[in-house]
Amino acid sequence: MTKSELIEKLAMRQSQLSAKEVESAIKEMLEQMAQTLEGGDRIEIRGFGSFSLHFRAPRTGRNPKTGTSVELDGKYVPHFKPGKELRERVDAINV
């Protein structure tokens, strides 16, 4: 699902809100989440999951075009850990 599909679906379910209002709310929510992670804080949405930063240590990588070794700096990457309720709902999907 894309952001625009989410906005469309929420606008249909919440008839008292226009698509523009839903879009504004989604954009603001995502901006607040990004700012929280930028500040090094963790986000927890009970039942859904949590977002945090994990540090990826410096390492030696490889340039796929040339095959030469490249030193990569350490960096923080966003990490999502699903909550119990979300895990249970996904586990219940019959394949």
Curated annotation (Swiss-Prot):
GO terms for cellular component: chromosome; cytosol. GO terms for biological process: DNA recombination; regulation of DNA-templated transcription; regulation of translation. Keywords: DNA recombination, DNA-binding, Transcription, Transcription regulation, Translation regulation. InterPro entries: Hist_DNA-bd (IPR000119), Histone-like_DNA-bd_CS (IPR020816), IHF-like_DNA-bd_dom_sf (IPR010992), IHF_beta (IPR005685). It comes from the Bacteria. The keyword Transcription regulation applies. Residues 56-76 are annotated as: Disordered. The keyword Transcription regulation applies. GO terms for molecular function: DNA binding; structural constituent of chromatin. Pfam families: Bac_DNA_binding. Signal peptide: none annotated. Belongs to the bacterial histone-like protein family. Heterodimer of an alpha and a beta chain. This protein is one of the two subunits of integration host factor, a specific DNA-binding protein that functions in genetic recombination as well as in transcriptional and translational control. This is Integration host factor subunit beta. The gene is ihfB.
